[in-house]
Amino acid sequence: MAPSAKDLLELFKVKQTALLLVTGVCAYLEGAGKPDPATLVLASLSMFLSIAGTTGFNMVLDADIDSAMFRTRNRPLPARRMSAKDAVLASSAALAAGLAAGVAVNPYVFVAGLLGFLIDIAVYTVLLKRKSPWSVVFGGFAGGMPALGGWAAATGGFGYQGVLLMLLVAVWSSLHIWTLSTYYSEDYRRAGVPMLPAVYGERAGVVASLAAAVAVFLVAFLAFRAGLISAVGFAVAAVPLVLAVAVLLKGLVSGEYREKAYRAFKLVNIFMGLFFVLLVLT
């Protein structure tokens, strides 16, 4: 039986994919000045399919981990609603189409998509995720590739501004994952995945999240100094990030590590979407 559309969307983590696509589209709009509709559509298609295909491969490789975790055991592969073969075929088709669309835009968009796949699958998922509590620091660079690709689609190259946007998403990825894995630390221990909060404890997860939040703020400030976002846009986007820091500090004092980390997780997601939207609007 062919996988359902719902299961395919879940395989590709469509909400997460959409958030990363927003970073790429906004990076394109910021860099283009006068956007070309055809280039925007083709670049968006390239980014969406490349991210989706990469995510699908990640789900195949992590199916055993997902089976062991309460949070993820109902995903299509561990729940056996989709075979690994079907998942690989769907992911391969999406990735190939995404990279082909990238070539049609320009070589830099293709390279960004390919690097995203290689970093996420080879470096993060295969080499580091099951071995190092610092895996997300390296894996986060995969999440930054759509922003870099979007900038490259607009400008014909990477450039320091494109690299800054990529770094912002990369550093934010550590914050995103550490806040979430602090809340679900017991799940990660059960699955044998050495996420930082699972190895060093929830308090360490909050401390690491605070350090990552400071790093995110600094990179965002550099983006402001580089002229990528206005002072008003930067100030407005920083509000949920500052609130997340306040929540994490409160958790550090009160000992409510898991609860405050989860609240901060929601706030930092708002920050990321807001920053990139304001990048364009301001």
UniProtKB/Swiss-Prot annotation:
Keywords: Cell membrane, Heme biosynthesis, Membrane, Transferase, Transmembrane, Transmembrane helix
Reaction(s) this enzyme catalyzes, per UniProt: heme b + (2E,6E)-farnesyl diphosphate + H2O = Fe(II)-heme o + diphosphate
Pathway entry: Porphyrin-containing compound metabolism; heme O biosynthesis; heme O from protoheme: step 1/1
EC number: 2.5.1.141
Coarse class of the protein's main subcellular location: membrane
Cellular component, GO annotation: plasma membrane
Molecular function terms from GO: protoheme IX farnesyltransferase activity
NCBIfam families according to UniProt: cyoE_ctaB
Name listed for the protein in its UniProt record: Protoheme IX farnesyltransferase
Organism, as annotated: Thermofilum pendens (strain DSM 2475 / Hrk 5)
Upper taxonomic lineage: Archaea, Thermoproteota, Thermoprotei, Thermofilales, Thermofilaceae
Name of the gene this protein is made from: ctaB
